[in-house]
Amino acid sequence: ARPSMTGAGRVHNFGAGPAVLPLEVVSEVAEALPNLSDSGFGLLEVSHRSEVFQSVIDSAEERVRRVLSVPGDYHVLFLQGGASTQFYMTALNLLGEAGKADFLVTGGWSQKAIKEAGRVGDVQSAWDGSGDGFVSVPSNGDYVIRDDADYVHYTSNNTLFGTQFHHLPDSGGKPRVVDASSDICGVPLDISSHDLVYAGAQKNLGPSGVTLVIISPWAISKIGD
């Protein structure tokens, strides 16, 4: 017998992702599969360039802006490739030919992030917790950011080791970039204090397959270079 969508037969998933979706969301998706917004097209059949699908994107962006209090001059993007793709895409767009980035390495995901960014430009660990087995995150004052760093990258919550920032990391006045995949919308996040926020959807936002990226006017100007 198939598990009931009413909850009694559903299995709870304690994995870090994909996340369990609310029954209301699952039911709404089920209704949209054969007929999206009374368009006559199913959700998986409708053109991604159509007005009816654009309304889905617009609604998602409006909710992201409202829930996260995204400043009006920031851009909200829904991209492919997962959060891991942003490890090097962020560096590729923000560092340029001679850029530098400093990283706070607090777990496995931030290790992966600095490794990928190192393929693009000059990166260094301003703080690295690997020597102690990643049992903590740094306090402000435990590290020094290079004067010529273009930005500072950190991972808000490393699920592999359970190291989570409960404060806004000091960036030495440099733009902040954060991988917020595993706690976005779960804890307060001041978007205006960051110039690029990215998060894979499957842990806190929804099903896998899309990455949320929020970028500031400064980041847009760097990408333009």
Language-model features: locations:
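Conserved PLP-enzyme active-site core in the AAT-like
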Residues: G15, A19, L23, F78, ...
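Basic/polar N-terminal segments that are highly enriched at the extreme N-terminus
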Residues: A1-R10
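A glycine-/small-polar-enriched, mobile loop at the entrance of the PLP active site in fold-type I
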Residues: R10-E61
